[in-house]
C-alpha cells in the first residue's frame, strides 16, 4: 500500500523544517550553557527517518492496528542521541503492542495535535503519550512560526 505523506501524518514543511533559536531555546539562555557540555561523551549513531518523516521504521504495517503513540518535539525525536535512548523507545519496552514515535523537531503543540488527530484516523490508538512543546511555536496559515514577535502576534 502506498500512502501520500501529505495525506496522513506529515505536517507541511516539517520534514525539511529548520527552526531558528528562539528566546528560551537559545543555548545562551538555557539553564546550562554549551561550556557545560565540554566533557559530554561523543556518541556514534545515525539519524534514520521513515518515509513519513519520523524517526522510526515505516508505519504502513500498523495501519488499522492497535498501537500506542508518542508525540512531541525534538526531545521525543531524541535529537542528539540514538533513537534507542529516546523516552518513546524506553516506554515501548513496557507494552505488548507497537509504540510509534511521532516526534517532530521544532513542533509546536498545535502541530502535535494535528498529528494526533491524523494518527487516530489511521491507527487504533490505545494510549497516547505527549511531551508538550514550547508555547511560542505555532502553525499559522500553514506556515510554522517559531519566533516570538514583539507585538505578540503569535498569541
Indicate residue ranges for each PLM-predicted region.
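Serine-esterase "nucleophile elbow" of acetyl-processing enzymes
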Residues: 48-110, 114-118
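N-terminal secretory targeting modules
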Residues: 1-69, 122, 126, 131-155
Amino acid at each position: 500500500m502506498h500512502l501520500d505523506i501529505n495525506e496522513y501524518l506529515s505536517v507541511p514543511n516539517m520534514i525539511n523544517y529548520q527552526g531558528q533559536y528562539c528566546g528560551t531555546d537559545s543555548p545562551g539562555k538555557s539553564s546550562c550553557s554549551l561550556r557545560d557540555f565540554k566533557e559530554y561523551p561523543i556518541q556514534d549513531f545515525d539519524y534514520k527517518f521513515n518515509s513519513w518523516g519520523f524517526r522510526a521504521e515505516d508505519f504502513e504495517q500498523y495501519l488499522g492496528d492497535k498501537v500506542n503513540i508518542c508525540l512531541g518535539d525534538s526531545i521525543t525525536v531524541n535529537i542528539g542521541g540514538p533513537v534507542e535512548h529516546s523516552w518513546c523507545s524506553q516506554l515501548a519496552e513496557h507494552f505488548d503492542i507497537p509504540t510509534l514515535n511521532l516526534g517532530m523537531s521544532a513542533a509546536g503543540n498545535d502541530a502535535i495535535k494535528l498529528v494526533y488527530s491524523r494518527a487516530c484516523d489511521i491507527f487504533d490508538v490505545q494510549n497516547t503519550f505527549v511531551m508538550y512543546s514550547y508555547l511560542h511555536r505555532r502553525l499559522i496559515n500553514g506556515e510554522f512560526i517559531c519566533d516570538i514577535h514583539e507585538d505578540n502576534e503569535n498569541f
